[in-house]
Design a protein with these regions (language model features):
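Conserved GNAT acetyl-CoA-binding A-motif
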Residues: 98, 104-117
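Conserved acetyl-CoA binding element of GNAT-fold acetyltransferases
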Residues: 75-86, 113, 145
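A short beta-loop-alpha structural element at the N-terminal edge
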Residues: 1-15
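Conserved beta-strand-loop-alpha-helix junction that forms the acyl-donor binding cleft
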Residues: 89, 111-122, 138-142
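Conserved acetyl-CoA pyrophosphate-binding loop and the N-cap/start of the following alpha-helix
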Residues: 88, 92-100
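Conserved beta-strand in the GNAT
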Residues: 54, 62-71, 78-83
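Conserved GNAT-fold acetyl-CoA-binding loop/helix
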Residues: 14-43
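A short helix-loop-beta-strand connector motif used in the catalytic cores of GNAT acetyltransferases and
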Residues: 41-54
Length: 151
């Protein structure tokens, strides 16, 4: 079940973030990525200004197994930290979370980004109607694609 996260969910969401983004760190060969260094106080600040959704597994004691967040900024909705517990991946939960966060911002322009190496992420976003509008080189080893969709 997908629903709005509460403040008391934030420690569990941060733990999920640390677990889920290990895959990205391995893919990039870089364990120094922001999602793995974020502190609870930073997540709490994001929570105050944005929308957080959580996916709970009713079969696992209502454990939080997925999450996504978004904030309206600079005329667009910035979607970020779309994550699913590694044991729950490949079941359509990422797509469900993306659709749910989009439903919170009907009629708006949504923007998100991912590494060019994250082929599965790019495939998911493109299949959901997102299109690349910019590629940024962060370093010789790291590039991000920025994608957008008008809801």
């Amino acid at each position: 079940m997908i629903c709005h996260a509460e403040a008391e969910d934030l420690p569990a969401i941060l733990e999920l973030q640390y677990l889920a983004y290990r895959t990205e760190a391995e893919l990039l060969g870089n364990w120094d990525i922001p999602p793995l260094k974020q502190k609870l106080s930073e997540v709490e600040e994001e929570f105050r200004t944005g929308v957080f959704l959580k996916l709970i597994s009713e079969n696992d004691g209502d454990a939080i197994v997925g999450s996504v967040r978004a904030v309206e900024k600079d005329g667009a909705v910035q979607i970020g930290k779309l994550m699913v517990h590694p044991q729950f991946r490949r079941r359509g939960y990422g797509r469900m979370l993306l659709s749910a966060i989009e439903a919170e911002f009907a009629g708006k322009r949504c923007v998100l980004f991912t590494s060019t190496r994250s082929v599965n992420n790019i495939r998911l976003y493109e299949s959901a109607g997102y299109r690349i509008f910019e590629t940024r080189t962060i370093s010789p080893e790291l590039k991000f694609v920025y994608m957008e969709k008008q809801l």
